[in-house]
Amino acid sequence: LEARGKGLSVAMSNVSNAKNIMDVAEGGFQNVMDILHTLKEKATQASDDSLSADQRTAIGNQITALIEEVDDIVAETKFNGSALIDGTYSKTFQTGEGVTDSLAVALNNSDSAALSINALDLSTHALATVAMGAIDSAITTLSTAIQEVGDIKSRLSSKETALSVAYTNTEAVRSTV
């Protein structure tokens, strides 16, 4: 019983760590989403056919800076040195005391190239409209990634509750023996 209790305790710690990782990933994804919303505003502004070439260029420069910020966020969203949202994060968390009690997680890439927003052109009304569509697609893609992280967090919370109950029950039995 003592070994089981210790195993459950370590599993709870693993689950807590996994939840922390998912929180960091979700925060990174959300920061990218905030920029996507700003990009959508800028592209909508640039699609106004009454803008001058200089105005479009200024908006284009802002867009370029925002896209660079997306890539910076992706590069900087890390946990214990591991990049989380650049498409390379694929780990298996030990979520229980048994050999098969694990959860495999692979997080999506949210850099500008993966979201197809790395080459937005706002130089004309028509191109700005195309950019709006690309940004809408990126928002949809990223929304799915955020939802997947939310689902993982929900599974981890359920597992954490089950482990806590099992640990409490194990300790109760152990104390009566």
Language-model segments: residues:
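Primary detection of the long, small/polar-rich alpha-helical "axial" segments characteristic
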Residues: L1-V177
